Amino acid sequence: MAYDVTGLWLESDLTADEEAFVSFYTSRTGTLTLVPGGTGGYYLLWITFRRPPTSREERERRDVEIQTVLAVLSPLLGYPHVIRRSPPRGSERVVSFGYGPNINHRPTTLSTELGVLLRELGLQEWARVEVGRHLVSKITQTLLEPHPPQFIRAFTQNTDLVPYEGLEVPEGPQPVARPHIEDDVIMQAVMISLGADLLPLAVQASTGDNYNVARYFVIPGRCTMERWPWNCARQAFGIHGAYTHVHSSVQRGIRGLGNLLFHSTLFPGGQTQGALTGLYATEPALGPRAHSRFRRIFAKGVQQAEMLQGAGVPTLGGFLKTVRTIATTPGNALAVCSISTTTSKECISLRRMIPQQTVVCLGRFEPTDGPDTYPNLYRDSSDNAVRILETLKLVQRLAKGPIFSGLNRSHDPAPVVRHLQALAPRTGLELFVSKLPDEVRAHLPADPAAGPDAVEAAVAEHFLNVYCSLVFAVVAESGAVPGDLGETPLEVLQRAARLCACQITVLGRTSEQPGIRIVDDLTGETTRVFSVDQPSSTPPSPWLALSDGVRVSGHPEDVDWGLFATGSTIHQLLRHATVGSKEFFTRHMDRCSNGLIAQQAGVGPLDIPVSDYHLVLHSSMLAERVAPRVPDTVEAITPSMANLLHKDFETWVKALPQELLPVPAWRGQAMAMGEQAYKMATNVSTGATYAITEALTNLMFSPVSKLQDVVLTGAVAWSPEDHQAGLLQECLFACKEFCRELGVALSISSAASSPTLSERHVRITQQQETVEVLPFNSVVFTSWAEVKGSRYRVTPDVKVEGNALVYLAVNQSCLIAGSTFEHNFLASRHPIPPLNPSTVASLFMLVKYLMSKRLIVSGHDIGDGGLLPSAIEMALAGCRGLQLSLPAHPNPLELMVSETPGALVEVPQVHLSEVLRAARDYRCVAHPLGTVGPEGQGNNVTILQNETVVFQETLTSLQVSWTSFSDEMWNLVTPPLHPLEDMHRKDLGRLEHHLGSLRAMCLGSQLRLFSCPTSPRRVAALVLPGSSAPYALMAALQNTGFEVATVTVEELKRGQSLSGFSGLITCLRTGCQASYASARGWVLALCNDPTCASTLTEFLNRPDTFSICCGEVGFQLLVALGVVGRSESSPYTYGPTPPQRWAVNLETNVSKLYDSHWLNIQIPQNTKSVFLRVLRGTVLPSWAQGEYLGVRYEQDALEYILRQRGEITLTYHGNAADETLPARHYPRNPTGNSTVAGLTSSDGRHAALIIDPSLMFHPWQWQHVPPDLTPLSMSPWAMAFQSIYLWSVKKINDHH
């Protein structure tokens, strides 16, 4: 096939890596010296067409297509103004250097997703689009070679990027060099059966009463869940009985969303409601590898969060632990991810599998051959995963009964062949070559005379032995299933896939003969090519039969505490990545987008991310709306009544009975993580029991009522070295016994080999250095429990001046062994003392007793860094000083850095004696340490011993140290800021709010609940393929009386009318890596489709309709349809406009990253917005989440025009409530430019908002409620949704 390649060079700013490179080599003596100010950057856009143009008309058409695509992709390319058709030329003193993805490799994930979008736009001749970079640098030396080695090392060494020599034309199908894929030895040893009559090690090492052995020891919880209607399924909203479960997995960089797909086959049709992530990484100490290690930590941590947010799953918290190594180690990273999924009870049933049933696969075939490396170009596509997950949800609604007889995936990491084997373990599969994906068939032998061996090799190399994010399923036998159309199970599945735009392929059928048979049916005769045995006929993993491991025993040496200065030691601990790393990652990941998150990591007035437990509720619906306890709680109204009510907002609420507290009524799930890799490096079994203890102490301040309610899910990362086998078995069974004695359930859900994270010198000579790899072993435990959302809980931020701070612990000893202090300051390892499970249980029960009596108001477990760093985190979170007095001890620093399991609790002085008495009753150690000081960052944390000050620092100084790792990460991955802007970079929190006349209502009232039975108001939630539904918006609208249903793009294309709807909302973002560019492409596709465009414009032009379009998708849709952001003021009708005429677009954040901040928002006094009119003049807090959180104007003075006309609905505001103080700087103004965060149409009916107001509908969704608004019984944002409902009902008579 003859391809045609076009390159475009688009002038842009330098990336953060390029800035660092230029800064390093500018005016530097040596073999490469860059001229100051002499380096420019370009994006290089590679466009590959399937064939060269054959006529002038075709070339002109391609030019038009290129301009359209550039307009769509312009945010991804930095809104370029200068575009070149040829590369910038180099000379003897000018380096012209291009680099990027390997064009001769398979397309990157970004390219694959863009390819799907381009086909949606009708650009069938476009084969591939890739984005690279190009630098032009003036140098002082004479250039001896085109690409100096310094450029190659800086931008392509140890990465998936390559230097470019020119516009290379790919030839034929893009090959992937695929080595023979070996099964992961740890996964096989732990998760796979050891023999015909033996259970897998993971099952043997698990314990619990209520369980089911389904691929592992599954311990589900019972709960309820929201079931949202799809327009195509004609079902009503409801709360249904459900199961919930937490699955934890080790992420080696192979198909990073395999855990979501695995869980979706275990609990089909479910909704993943939240995730926790952890990261182990090589410590980025000083040295030649420091920069690359930092980059790998950033890439791995952010990549995991980005994939989850693309799938609509908030990341609630997690950990980062770095491992010390020698300076020459390249560095590596290993991620752990735990996800919580809830599924309706009727969705988990399967039908009986018999021969001749259809085998299908869901999803795009996008194979990789091994772990992804920096910069993660071939990571999993969230867009593809969401299409699969949404199809599995929808098919359950369409069929109204089970249609699958097999739905299974192997434990990851595993190639396709393992997933097929897991699909039908007791029967056989017969797959046909003609049904294999196109890419596989493209690699089949072209010669018809090629024998079966050649076909077998091609199928094995390009299909069976690759990693791919597909879901394989066996569809039940023919016969109509319950439903509207009398379809067969396969037809129902195909319809669901079509509606969700999910690729579905019929591969073959089940058979009586065991094993997998690949049948070549492309020749005249049907010929069996080869078969693959089932796992049961293969020998079990021999790894566990290997010799016992080498146990690392501690070599205790007396610590000379006099060598360590207290102040500098504490500051070094705070600067360590393990202690102070959470801030950067927390501020740059989705924390709450589904509206179910009652506790994420950030707490206190400064949103300091120190909460170790996290809380996700199973519903954000008002209980009185769904299941009213009193008749007539939901009041029926008519349009005339709505008209009267709409005029007086004081009639929208009713007084809240004093005995009722403003707390969520639904149950939820509390989650926390625990790990102790440092301690396991000395003793794996004892260290793992400390990890279990940490998982429990992290969870104990949540609403969990008793220890027996807790379930632990374990993920094993283990060295595959032969001598580690015995240690693994010993460790897992020690964990089982420890959990049995505690009375908590344990399930091992995944296992994988650990990469090389650390090395040490064995021998160093002048000629060479000999190093050995240090084995890395860890078990990460995720603790979780079903809890009542109304139950009392506490957070780590100290609250009240004068309260006592009490130290609770399991014993009196100081624990330095395996601590962060030991890992970073001491050369020897101390032996790890064993833990007594009864004392751990006593500590847990003591804290629960104190909480049940409301004797404590804040609490924090003793975590990484020890006692004093934990106390400092509480002080930082509460923005209050501390004055503490240590008990008598010869080495006060030893007390401060001790990691003995325990907790710090804040106790009102009137309850102190009762708390100490309770501690004695529970046989726990309790020491009153001191008191909480006044509020203010200028106050001190002071530590005394025998009335002598041994440590004293201001909160400001401590926060500088605690955030130093985050600052280093920021400086590494973000563009440099002007010094005046950099001054404001940490200016967050301490928000003052102005509720105006709504204040009294919000402090003592609740919404009246209305409905209009005679003419229900319906809202369409338009969801793009590969995007998650806007569940928070849907719940907020349903709460105020609307009936909300999901509408797919496919329905619009097929002529689905919106005449039965009065409101429109959209998904907020797409699942693609370049979400905003993808959103623009989809919006253009909707505008280009005559049926979709006509349906949408007809709806928007109706005078009785409204829309609340939030986020990247919603904002751009209203812009593209000419609804908002227009300069003309005369009345006009809405309709599609080309992207070159879009007057406003979204602007990227200053950080160039996804941001998640709790900010002040002002609603202008003159806004025309029908939705937000009731909030005029107020200053309210809001979640601002996204990568593009500002408005960019393409016409001069347009913002002034819109502001004067009252078409601006929201603006970013400073921390003060004064309406004259808008936010000018990042992060209070995420883009640092226009303060606008929302627009409205000229008649006020349609709102295009950057933020999502539904994320603040309930008080429990707020990051922080200030004391002057406590207790907040109703969020003012809820009044906006009440307003739009009453407006919609009163407009009923306007719809003819």
Curated annotation (Swiss-Prot):
Listed GO MF terms: phosphoribosylformylglycinamidine synthase activity
Pfam families assigned to the protein according to its UniProt record, in alphabetical order: AIRS_C (PF02769), FGAR-AT_PurM_N-like (PF22689), GATase_5 (PF13507), Tegument_dsDNA (PF12818)
InterPro entries: Class_I_gatase-like, FGAR-AT_PurM_N-like, Herpes_virus_tegument, PurM-like_C_dom, PurM-like_C_sf, PurM-like_N_sf, Tegument_herpes_virus_N
Principal subcellular localisation of the protein: virion
Subcellular location: Virion tegument
Keyword list, A-Z: Virion, Virion tegument
Iron recorded as keyword: no
Gene Ontology BP annotations: intracellular transport of virus; purine nucleotide biosynthetic process
Cellular component aspect of the GO annotation: host cell; viral tegument
Keyword Nucleotidyltransferase: no
Listed name of the protein: Protein ORF75
Species per Swiss-Prot/TrEMBL record: Human herpesvirus 8 type P (isolate GK18) (HHV-8)
